[in-house]
Amino acid sequence: MSDPAQALGQGDVMTIQEVLLPLFLEVILTFVLLFWLAPLRGSDFSSGVTRPENVALREPNWSKRSLQVAYSYSNQFELPVLFYVLTILAWVTRHADLIFVVLAWVFVIFRYLQAFVHVTSNQVRLRGAFFGVSALVLAIMWIIYMIEILTAPWV
């Protein structure tokens, strides 16, 4: 067997574009939140809501809007990091099949839904439900990947 995918017992591996598009959209979400946050914080400074010396002492009084966007932005460096790692591993080991890509899309869609609720109504139950679905989907992706890797024949 010269094809690594066949040697690892894999079916059809998706194209790099199909695999990375959900990851790219998650990265875009992170940058959208960042570039939204910057002017909000600038406005907080110019309106006097927040003072630079308070930020330096880690005691800022950001506006509610700034806090919502900041927390949503910060949240993009928690669970999505595991998604980024898994996507790269799945591609490199040729385990990024159709099931992987579909689950990746579900993960990213629920991350967008969570971020949307976070920066709009901020309904904790709804936001938590969206987070829970994305966390469960990512856990399933990791479990499938681990099983595939651990049960693959040695090449």
Language model region names:
Residues 143-155:
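Juxtamembrane boundary at the C-terminal end of a transmembrane helix
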Residues 1-18, 153-155:
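Short, strongly hydrophobic alpha-helical membrane anchors
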